[in-house]
Amino acid sequence: MFGKLNADNCELFPLVLSSCDKCSDLWQPFFMLLKKYWPQMDERIYLCTETKRCHFDGLDICSPLNMPAGSTWSENLIKLLQYVKEDYLVFMLDDFWLKAPVNIQLLERCQQIMRTNADVGFICLVPQLEPSVENPLSEEFPGLIEYGRQTPYRVTTQAGLWRKDYLQRILLSHESAWWFEMFGSKRSRRMPWRSFVVQTPVFRYDDGGVLYRGCYVSEYAKWFAENEGIELTPGRRMGSKRTLQQEQTEMGLLQKLHPRYVYEYVRSHI
């Protein structure tokens, strides 16, 4: 089904930045750090947010959406991908605030792997797991680990390279980002594309991003305020990651009792 592609006919890798209008306060810090730690970035940036627009000097930011209130994370991304002309993309979330220079050499190598191997659908650009029998070191692509078919979270919203048509195939319009990772990983088992993850990070940012369920992670956010001069949003709640995770665990137990949860759960398995 798949074969080698001619690298001379390849498309570029624009950045798709997944966000939402209520997180617009994250954009200026994100782009400031992007310019600082990835100054070579000169490709288009597609900002996936419901209605708002953003400008940052020196960056080509496109915000094409005008989504209705209540649209889901996946609905927004599905719609945005219709505007992306390129066949490949770099995907990031708005709270992945960079803390160190991007590993350009490794990024370009991963891009070349995807360009020239049509069965490579996703390469996660931050380490996620250690090599194992289920997730072996790739002999074909040294420095990469190949996700096993049964590995949980072989589809993730961590920073990564995507083949656009693969991403479009996995997305279901009713899902949140968290459900996309959970159930998209299961759907991906039935698809022919392979997924990989780097052993050495291309991007360096705090684990999971500077937010947790919409709240600043205090140990992360304060670092940026002190070391990068980032002005944090006064109205955005802040808490330790441990506290925020515990609250989410307790809330999640209640959510699973709601009929809507059961309905959406079934939809993700169809």
What annotation goes with each model-predicted range?
Residues 1-12, 230-270:
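Membrane-proximal basic amphipathic "stem/tether" segments
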Residues 101-130:
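Conserved donor-nucleotide/metal-binding helix-loop-beta segment in metal-dependent transferases, i.e.
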Residues 136-152:
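Short, flexible, basic/aromatic active-site loop/helix in glycosyltransferases
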